[in-house]
Amino acid sequence: MPENPSSSPTEPPEQSAAFEKWRSGLAQFTGLGLSESEKAERERLKAQGKLAKDWDKCEGWKRDLMNYSPMITFLLNHLKLAGCPFPSSAMQCHPCPENRAGGFSPDHGILLCQDRFFNKKHMEDTLAHELVHAFDHCRFKVDWGNLRHHACSEIRAANLSGDCRFTREVKRGFYAFNKQHQACVKRRAILSVLANPACTSPEMAEKAVNEVWESCFTDTRPFDEIY
């Protein structure tokens, strides 16, 4: 019996499966033609892949800095000399909210915000900043609930880490040639103290920073001078 000309020939199963695989792959690549659940899964996998990529980069930079950065190796050595060796495991790479690059906790060590670094130099400055806090906590027994203590460590960390170098300030939109470094250190110290739960106002943060400014800005330990 002749075939009905209006009917379509049935595709072999393997050909149909190959087409579906191609269609699905194209949809995943472009995002077009996906169901809502498929779109959600696609975004989840993309985010998961980005997290893994950011973590790998952060860990790689951390290893490089611990081995080859004069600033970081110097601070790590002085932490060890002070009786507080700081292993790699105490410096953790994690994703963070915006406007944060790192942090120090006496209980948990150093946080490195893996998705917030512009480049390795930015990470070096951040790690140096947090290692100054670690050094202060070890060497001077900082009470982080005491705003004057906190202010002093923030002044020292901003002053010594490279966080306030001129090029960083230009990127932040601050342009001044007269005492720009001091202005940056004070501004950033006040912002950090303001985030302390014991601080209830910008005026309180500024007062704490001003009260310890002279002694803490000139205290460059463990460096002989500003790096």
Curated annotation (Swiss-Prot):
Question: Which EC number applies?
Answer: 3.4.24.-
The principal localisation class reads mitochondrion
Database matches in Pfam families: Peptidase_M76
Where found, per UniProt? Mitochondrion inner membrane
The UniProt annotation places a divalent metal cation binding at: H129, H133
Any idea which residues are catalytic in this one?
E130
Keywords from the named record: Hydrolase, Membrane, Metal-binding, Metalloprotease, Mitochondrion, Mitochondrion inner membrane, Protease
Q: What does this protein do?
A: Has a dual role in the assembly of mitochondrial ATPase. Acts as a protease that removes N-terminal residues of mitochondrial ATPase CF(0) subunit 6 at the intermembrane space side. Also involved in the correct assembly of the membrane-embedded ATPase CF(0) particle, probably mediating association of subunit 6 with the subunit 9 ring.
Q: Which domain of life is it from?
A: Eukaryota
- The EC category is hydrolase
Q: Name it.
A: Mitochondrial inner membrane protease ATP23
* Topology of this chain in the membrane: Peripheral membrane protein
Tell me the disulfide pairings in this chain.
none
Q: So what family is this one in?
A: Belongs to the peptidase M76 family.
Q: Is tRNA processing set as a keyword in this record?
A: no
Hydrolase found in the keyword field: yes
GO BP terms, alphabetized:
mitochondrial protein processing; mitochondrial proton-transporting ATP synthase complex assembly
Q: Kindly list the GO CC terms recorded for this protein.
A: mitochondrial inner membrane
Query: Which InterPro entries does its entry note?
Result: Peptidase_M76_ATP23
GO MF terms listed in the record are: metal ion binding; metalloendopeptidase activity
